[in-house]
């Protein structure tokens, strides 16, 4: 807890989100913009709001987020992870509910590196018999 803000760090792919929550009226600000202006896809907005809807805290908190790296989906996942951790910092009794939904666990899948002699990570060069 920093002042009257509860804090959580979320990560997904190469995105990192620093999330601060405090009691308020439900405003979510991402990198200085309202959430609807920052995320263009409806699915990204749904992903971010999942932990709040699950715990029935949709309009209970004002949320301030700084997110860097990655694309839109990775950033949305990082924000969700950060909100989950901040909610657990606020109230530890929410952990079993959030854990059961799979929001506490960090999604460890990362981009596989490109290998030498391949076009992409696994796509080989076309084989020619002759």
UniProtKB/Swiss-Prot annotation:
| Keyword Transmembrane helix attributed | no
- GO BP terms in the entry: translation
Q: Give the top-rank taxon of the lineage listed in the UniProt record for this protein.
A: Bacteria
Q: InterPro entries, alphabetically? A: Ribosomal_Su5_D2-typ_SF, Ribosomal_uS9, Ribosomal_uS9_bac/plastid, Ribosomal_uS9_CS, Ribsml_uS5_D2-typ_fold_subgr
Please give the Gene3D superfamilies that the UniProt record associates with this protein: 3.30.230.10
Question: Which family is this sequence assigned to?
Answer: Belongs to the universal ribosomal protein uS9 family.
Name of the encoding gene: rpsI
Among Pfam families, the record links this protein to: Ribosomal_S9
Tell me which species this is from.
Paraburkholderia xenovorans (strain LB400)
The protein's name is Small ribosomal subunit protein uS9
Question: Which GO cellular component term is one of those annotated?
Answer: cytosolic small ribosomal subunit
Q: Which UniProt keywords apply?
A: Ribonucleoprotein, Ribosomal protein
Q: Which GO terms describe its molecular function?
A: RNA binding; structural constituent of ribosome
């Amino acid at each position: 807890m920093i002042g009257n803000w509860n804090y959580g760090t979320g990560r997904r792919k190469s995105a990192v989100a620093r999330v601060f929550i405090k009691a308020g009226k439900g405003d979510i600000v991402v990198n200085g913009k309202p959430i609807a202006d920052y995320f263009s896809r409806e699915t990204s907005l749904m992903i971010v709001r999942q932990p709040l809807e699950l715990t029935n805290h949709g309009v209970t908190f004002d949320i301030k987020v700084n997110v860097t790296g990655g694309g839109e989906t990775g950033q949305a996942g990082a924000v969700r992870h950060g909100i989950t951790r901040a909610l657990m910092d606020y109230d530890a009794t929410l952990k079993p509910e959030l854990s059961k939904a799979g929001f506490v666990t960090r999604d460890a899948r990362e981009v596989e590196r490109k290998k030498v002699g391949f076009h992409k990570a696994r796509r080989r060069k076309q084989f020619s018999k002759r």
